[in-house]
Amino acid sequence: MHGYSYEAMRLTAELNNAFHTPEEIREIMGRITGRPIDETFRLFPPFYTDFGKNIRIGRRVFINACCCFQDQGGISIGDGTLIGHRVTLATINHGLPPDRRHVHNIAPIVIGKDVWIGSGTILLPGVHVGDGAVVAAGSVVREDVPPRTIVAG
């Protein structure tokens, strides 16, 4: 696990510390995720991830600047999804009691097709966002979002 984390830090530093064309960004993201990235993908750096290999990105996905993906539990992003500035996708949490705080609770985040995640949103472990849903800017999402709904708060 630590080897992949250090590789993700190295690759995100490469991505974030110089200008890159869209083609170069896709190539670096392919190395971060360990899989090819579709030519319709767009990302505005900087971008941060602590693992990288558990991110799956569909077609026509746009990720805006300053997003943080904690992907050890797995992150899946469906086709046509838009992700705003400073969105955090967190797939790991810690136990609440002091004697359990070093225990990781891991659950995947699944984002459906044609979803819009507003700027500053935080999705917590285990959240599924249904197709066509909108999550308003600044939301903290701890429960599943049904398809074609708008949630805020």
Give, region by region, the residue ranges found by the protein language model.
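Terminal amphipathic alpha-helical/low-complexity segments used for targeting or macromolecular assembly
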Residues: 1-40
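Flexible, glycine/small-residue-enriched loop-and-beta-strand segment within the central core
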Residues: 47-57, 62-128
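Flexible glycine-rich beta->alpha loop in the catalytic core of nucleotide-sugar glycosyltransferases
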Residues: 87, 94, 139-140, 146
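Beta-rich strand-turn-strand
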Residues: 119-134, 138-144
